[in-house]
């Protein structure tokens, strides 16, 4: 190709790349400005640009400077005869070094580049640790190794043909790749400059934990950058000197010239100093060792690996000084080179063999005695990292005291026993409330609302499900550009169901159902809740959902084309968006920029758009919050909250009535001695609550744990992003709940780390497990569930998340953990342990007893034979005073139509199990003692029919 054409091609490519970059920066700035947080993006952009520039210049200078020196001295001749070396062996060694470097670099870059930064911060591998190098070469897989082999051999062939164009190209690409990679790692580098003391220190090096949480991740990234720069420089310079002076044609190497040797010695000094620093860093990384019975530094790490690293750190420093001193005197003696080679081989052998020998011959025969002090640290730091040290432990001794009088005294608990699970309710919704194929209910969540009832103000547990628009369900013939971006723009409304009520046919009851003008808000007489009470707490005034879980396409609104609002009979009702979401399209020039940003060539030619049209993009709530704060990890279960429009306006929320609440976490994998278990992190705090307006798309971040050092640091870096929790509108704050993902992580760690005695911990004879249950005919692990109950020492009912535990390998229940959600008690964990000398039935044992009951099993078998299927719901353990009540709903589904109907309720208490059509009948049958006279407070709860069932002797 002519040189002028290639230059034109490069110029055009550079202009296109620059235009694309500037367009992206401009549109992102508009997007963040529309959200009221432009400084969040501009600060991030400035940091990334600074990292890219500094690292790019540094790596380019390092590699380029060495190559320039090598080019100047590549033809220098040795000043004295040197033994001739066969080039074949040298070429083989150089090729293997080059392939290993490229393979390991490719693997590390891909691991960091492909990480999902929102779910957990990207974790680079421990570059240059011998364990990582060994495992990477063995287990890297065909892709990185194959890529390294291909690049290594290919570059070597090209190098023999056109060495300098190849070296310049590879060095430029390497510098660019490292600069880009480092700029992406701003999440781990920037906090190191804003971190403050955590006050706690690690037990080995006595360093503040802020070093491990903030500075160690940054040092690991910079170590990686320096390693690539030095390794590339050394290999490239070595290749230049080896293959110069007709070495290839003569098939022999005549030795290095003094200038070349001085150059290589300077590189060797730099590498020795780097390795000394790496050994210092690797000592701290031992705090995350997984060797032996302890997570963190154990006996072998403390007395073998740590001393080895300390000795090597000193030796590398001495080697650097010796090399510098000897290089000033002249050429390195051959014995020095041989000694360095022998020392390197010996070091690798010692690192691989000595820890294994000590672990197997010294530690394992006396493991408990050797590891005891380290087990204490692992228990202590793991409990701190997961917040288990804040759990309040109490004894729960179930008594045979449950009767109708106790149930009456705990009316709000009984009234909120969940009979509808989210899965069968979603099945019902999809058949009864989906309305059209393009609507979908992606999830249903448990929440509570405080409603005015005929017996007073009370909490009511509900299941809420958003009716979102799923564009993927649109028929293929209707999938046009206009429909995708102008017509099908939003979902509509939601369903709200009490968890404890069903219609006479067994289908769920609804507080809110249907769509558009037919939307109905309905009370529930059986619960003593009027329609007016529901309307006072819940609004359907602005039910449109422009931002949700399924809203992945960008839309333009308002436009000259009306948007589909909702179907009405055989027709559709249309609407025009009047919200504040999105970015104004503006003039035609900006329209062209949006076209480039969205990669949508139709956009500039659409006649339906105006200057006032807004571009609503990044509408999927998880994508939206991750774009704003990628340093947080987000819960898998966002939930919708409906707010009375008048209350919302009075609280400064505008006339919006639907808001998403999403829990966000600060996480790290650099908390010393903290065992991550099955998680990709070993430290977690629920530091932030995120509120997203479903109509306008506004996003607010509220700090709920100001003591967390991670969120303290991020709030200093982004002061305009976060608000204190006291700034949240009370109407939304009343819907906060203990987050599911955090509770699962904590309860998972508690299975092992409830044990404080290291001897018992090591023996593993007091491990817990999650109980099992039969759900819809399949065995499944009991998942944490929300409920409303009154804790034994509490004054009133509250909204909790609860999970039971059983001993490992046994089915009886041994404890239960509760996370509190209401008021000042929010965020507290309570662990109730059962007496060890008594047998408390676990869910699996209750399930077995249900299956063994002849009447229940006969009825279920009969249903299954009649073309239907009886599906078990979640078996709930309900603590009431000092007793445990077990409740399991039973649904009936037709074999051809999976529309579940609540057909029976099974309740169990002590050695009694009953199954009846309703919860009230079950309780009446389960507790057949005489019923005390109902007080006026309790009378409105029951309908006439229900009262007759529960109180047959009352007139």
UniProtKB/Swiss-Prot annotation:
The chain crosses the membrane at residues 12-32, 45-65, 85-105, 141-161, 163-183, 224-244, 263-283, 306-326, 343-363. It comes from the Bacteria. It is a multi-pass membrane protein. One of its GO terms (cellular component) is extracellular region. Belongs to the UPF0182 family. PANTHER family: UPF0182 PROTEIN SLL1060. This is UPF0182 protein Synpcc7942_1783. It comes from Synechococcus elongatus (strain ATCC 33912 / PCC 7942 / FACHB-805).
């Amino acid at each position: 190709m002519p040189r002028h054409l290639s230059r034109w091609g490069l110029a055009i490519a550079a202009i296109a790349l620059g235009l694309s970059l500037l367009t992206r920066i401009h549109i992102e700035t508009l997007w963040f400005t529309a959200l009221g947080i432009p400084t969040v993006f501009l600060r991030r952009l400035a940091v990334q640009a600074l990292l890219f520039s500094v690292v790019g210049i540094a790596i380019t200078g390092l590699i380029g400077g060495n190559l320039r020196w090598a080019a100047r001295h590549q033809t220098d001749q040795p000043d004295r005869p040197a033994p001739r070396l066969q080039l074949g062996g040298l070429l083989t060694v150089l090729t293997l070094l080059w392939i290993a470097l490229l393979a390991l670099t490719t693997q590390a870059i891909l691991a960091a580049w492909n990480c999902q930064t929102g779910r957990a911060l990207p974790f680079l591998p421990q570059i240059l640790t011998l364990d990582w190098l060994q495992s990477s070469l063995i287990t890297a897989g065909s892709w990185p190794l194959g890529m390294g082999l291909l690049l290594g051999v290919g570059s070597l062939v090209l190098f023999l043909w056109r060495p300098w164009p190849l070296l310049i190209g590879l060095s430029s690409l390497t510098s660019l790749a490292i600069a880009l990679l480092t700029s992406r790692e701003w999440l781990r580098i920037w906090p190191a400059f804003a971190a403050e003391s955590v006050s706690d220190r690690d037990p080995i090096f006595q360093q503040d934990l802020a070093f491990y949480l903030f500075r160690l991740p940054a040092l690991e990234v910079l170590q990686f950058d320096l390693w690539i720069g030095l390794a590339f420089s050394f290999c490239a310079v070595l290749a230049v000197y080896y293959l110069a002076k007709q070495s290839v044609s003569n098939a022999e190497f005549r030795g290095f010239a003094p200038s070349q040797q001085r150059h290589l010695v300077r590189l060797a000094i730099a590498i020795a100093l780097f390795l000394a620093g790496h050994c210092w860093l690797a000592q701290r990384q031992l705090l995350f060792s997984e060797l032996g019975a302890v997570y963190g530094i154990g006996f072998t790490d403390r007395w073998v690996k740590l001393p080895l690293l300390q000795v090597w750190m000193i030796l590398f420093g001495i080697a650097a000084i010796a090399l510098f001193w000897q290089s000033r005197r002249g050429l390195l003696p051959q014995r020095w080179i041989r000694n360095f080679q022998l020392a390197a081989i010996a070091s690798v052998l010692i690192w691989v063999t000595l820890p294994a020998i000590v672990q197997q011959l010294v530690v394992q025969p006396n493991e408990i005695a050797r590891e005891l002090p380290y087990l204490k640290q692992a228990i202590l730091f793991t409990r701190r990292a997961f917040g288990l040290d804040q759990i309040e432990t109490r004894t729960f001794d179930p008594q045979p005291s449950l009767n109708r009088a106790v149930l009456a005294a705990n009316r709000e608990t009984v009234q909120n026993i969940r009979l509808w699970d989210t899965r069968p309710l979603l099945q019902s919704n999809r058949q009864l409330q989906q309305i059209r194929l393009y609507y979908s209910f992606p999830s249903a969540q448990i929440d509570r609302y405080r409603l005015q009832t005929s017996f007073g103000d009370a909490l009511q547990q509900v299941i809420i499900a958003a009716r979102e628009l799923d564009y993927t369900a649109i028929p293929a013939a209707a999938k046009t550009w206009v429909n995708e971006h102008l017509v099908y723009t939003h979902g509509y409304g939601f369903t709200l169901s009490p968890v404890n009520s069903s219609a006479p046919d067994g289908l769920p009851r609804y507080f809110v159902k249907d769509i558009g003008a037919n939307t109905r808000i309905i009370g529930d007489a059986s619960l003593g809740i009027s329609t007016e009470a529901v309307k006072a707490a819940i609004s359907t005034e602005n039910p449109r959902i422009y931002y949700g879980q399924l809203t992945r396409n960008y839309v333009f609104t308002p436009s000259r084309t009306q948007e589909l609002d909702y179907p009405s009979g055989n027709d559709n009702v249309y609407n025009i968006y009047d919200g504040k979401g999105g970015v104004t399209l503006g003039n035609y020039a900006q329209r062209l920029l949006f076209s480039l940003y969205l990669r949508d060539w139709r956009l500039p030619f659409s006649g339906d758009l105006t200057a006032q049209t807004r571009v609503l993009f990044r509408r999927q709530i998880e994508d939206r919050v991750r774009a704003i704060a990628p340093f947080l990890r987000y819960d898998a279960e966002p939930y919708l909250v409906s707010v009375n429009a008048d209350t919302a306006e009075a609280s400064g929320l505008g006339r919006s009535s639907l808001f998403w609440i999403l829990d966000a976490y600060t996480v790290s994998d650099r908390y010393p001695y903290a065992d991550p278990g099955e998680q990709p992190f070993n430290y977690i705090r629920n530091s932030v609550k995120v509120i997203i307006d479903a109509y306008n798309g506004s996003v607010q971040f509220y700090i709920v744990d100001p003591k967390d050092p991670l969120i303290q640091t991020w709030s200093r870096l982004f002061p305009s992003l976060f608000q204190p929790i006291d700034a949240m509108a009370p109407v939304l704050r009343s819907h906060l709940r203990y987050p599911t993902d955090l509770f699962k992580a904590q309860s998972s760690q508690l299975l092992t780390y409830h044990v404080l005695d290291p001897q018992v911990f090591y023996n593993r004879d007091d491990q817990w497990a999650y109980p099992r249950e039969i759900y819809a005919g399949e065995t499944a692990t009991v998942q944490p569930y929300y409920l409303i109950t009154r804790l034994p020492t509490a004054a009133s009912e509250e909204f909790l998340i609860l999970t039971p535990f059983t001993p490992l390998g046994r089915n009886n229940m041994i404890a239960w953990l509760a996370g509190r959600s209401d008021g000042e008690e929010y965020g507290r964990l309570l662990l109730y342990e059962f007496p060890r000398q008594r047998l408390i039935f676990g869910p699996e044992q209750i399930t077995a007893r249900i299956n063994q009951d002849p009447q229940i099993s006969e009825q279920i078998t009969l249903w299954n034979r009649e073309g239907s299927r009886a599906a078990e719901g979640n078996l709930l353990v309900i603590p009431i005073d000092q007793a445990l009540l077990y409740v399991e709903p039973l649904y009936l589904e037709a074999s051809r139509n999976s529309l579940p109907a609540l057909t029976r309720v099974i309740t169990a208490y002590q050695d009694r199990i009953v199954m009846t059509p309703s919860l009230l009948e079950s309780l009446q049958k389960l507790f057949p003692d005489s019923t005390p006279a109902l007080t006026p407070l309790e009378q409105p709860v029951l309908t006439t029919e229900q009262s007759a069932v529960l109180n047959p002797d009352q007139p």
